[in-house]
Amino acid sequence: MLQARQEEKQQGSKTKKNKKNWKRIVPIAAAACVCVIVGATVGIKQINKGNNKTLDAATIASAADQKETTQTLITAKDYKEIKKCIKEYNKQMARDNNSMAIGMYESASSSDATSAESSNVSDTGAYSDTNLRENGVGEADIVKTDGKNIYTLCRSVVTITAIDNGSMEKLASIEQDAERYVEDIYVQDDKLVLFGTLGRQVGNSEDSEAYDGYYENNTYVQVYDISDPSNPKEIGNMEQSGGYNTSRIVDGYVYVLSQFHPYEDNVTARDLWYIPEVQGKSIEAENIYMPQEAEGNEYTIITAFSLDNPSEKTDSKAVFGYSDVCYVSENNIYITSNYYEDSDVSRTLIRKISYTDGKLVGVAQTKIKGMLNDSFSIDEYEGNLRLVTTIDEIYSNDDIMPLNETADKTEKAVAENVKDAVPGTNSLYVLNDKLEIIGSIHNLAKDETIYSARFMGDTGYFVTYRQVDPLFSVDLSDPENPKILGELKIPGFSEYLHPYGDGKLLGIGMDVSEDGFTTEGVKLSMFNVTDPSNVTEENKYTIEESYGTDVGYNYKGVFVDVQKNLFGFVTYHDGVTYQLYTYDEAEGFKEVMSRQLSGYEGSRGLYIGDVFYLVSGNMIESYSMNGFEKMDDIVL
């Protein structure tokens, strides 16, 4: 059943948390902080030198072959080509047990993973919304409100609670069978949307080589009519192959991403076991994009449908390759993954899929040197894509492979833009709408790692860290000639950056001693960015006795309302505490509410009218925003 999977997801979340929550003495220089905000099923990430050379050249191009071909998004000719690709890759992995390939598939929670350009305020201003990564792009979460009710998700049970100026009453709940695990919910226009993973056992010990067979995960979506919130009614559903990754909602259309790892077995004997399905039907070959590199055994699947007709897909695409960091702008979906070539240099593969009114179109794909920290390290603005990466391993001269170009032009771009990049540094790239490099800066912050980033219009900010926290500011007004404007060095580091009104940038991270070895607690920083060339730390505040927070990998857990001058999040002390702060330029940070929680099951803060609601697991508490005195509570 799905119990094992749920425990694995919870354990994975704890593992992430431990990486972030240092206590007392920590060897900072050895810390490698990589925050991934999307839940993903991780497939083959790495290969040893020369491994891909033994693959069928007509099926998967080697690194050398890639230099001689353009890298447009190419669809499969037919199912035979896809099957051959998967079988060749699986044979290669079986032949080389000493390969650097990592895992078959390990699940990561879609706390979704990671990040927010916008404030989480509704259009009316009467209630708050989830902290979003991109303005205008809706995201599902574990808590939602429509201003009249609060919708909560806890242990796969969705509960609808009516609110009335701080008073609360449970109206209804939606429960699932043991094989279904709900991971996200969304509310819009009297519709409640549930996203989750359905696990089915395939085979048993009598007719399968595997003991008790194996579990096949499918992503499922259920849409309910909540015009009568006390009696929600299911009006449609969608199902697709693979475990749930993430989702977005734009202009009434839902876009669902899942990770599918085909498994050939002798039980089901399904002829097209290697082809993903949507609503029980195989995705057509012309809608399946072939591997960009030697990643021929896993898919990222995208399905679109309208909330008005949730059982009928409007489009679907399958892209070979897993999704490490997924970023969705107002017009495009960017699927990225880490990749290690023959040279053992880390790279990021990028695939671009445009979307509009439920239709999906493959645009381009490329690769850049280095790895993304999270979805804030990648941002689309005025048709260009800006990224900051950390360069690992040794240098290779085939850094960028722009799309739709000849090998000669590609190599010229590499020579002009990447030749000075060295390992152990960081880079900034600007790519055009075809994912061709048009601007770059290299060799930033030697021996440091990017911990957070925020792009704000024509200016970008990013934090690197080893022993001190340099906050870099970058002028991006000329995309072809980005320039470093300034560099502020202070102890500690910021894991999360958020715009906080005109000329202000909020940072949340850790305060660390100047020697870089002793943590002092969770640190709040307010940066004055009025002059990007002369950024200053206007005020700072250390939460004593705290040793961590999850804001670096779970941006949805951060409540920020600039107009109300409030922000809150969970910190870890001897227990778990939700803390709410306000800010004044003269007086600095001030704690206005602190509530110790009984455990960590996902906590969110939100407001409706003049009441602040704190949700933790199956508990909701209400507080007056005039003094933050408790008004009511309910256990669901």
What are these regions (language model features)?
Residues 24-25, 155:
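Extended, solvent-exposed functional surface patches
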Residues 1-20:
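Disordered, charged N-terminal biogenesis/targeting segments of membrane/secreted proteins
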Residues 47-636:
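Beta-sheet-rich non-transmembrane sensory/scaffold domains
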Residues 25-26, 39, 409, 503:
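Generic signature of intrinsically disordered, low-complexity, basic-rich segments
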Residues 1-6, 26-53:
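Single-pass transmembrane signal-anchor helices and their membrane-water interface zones
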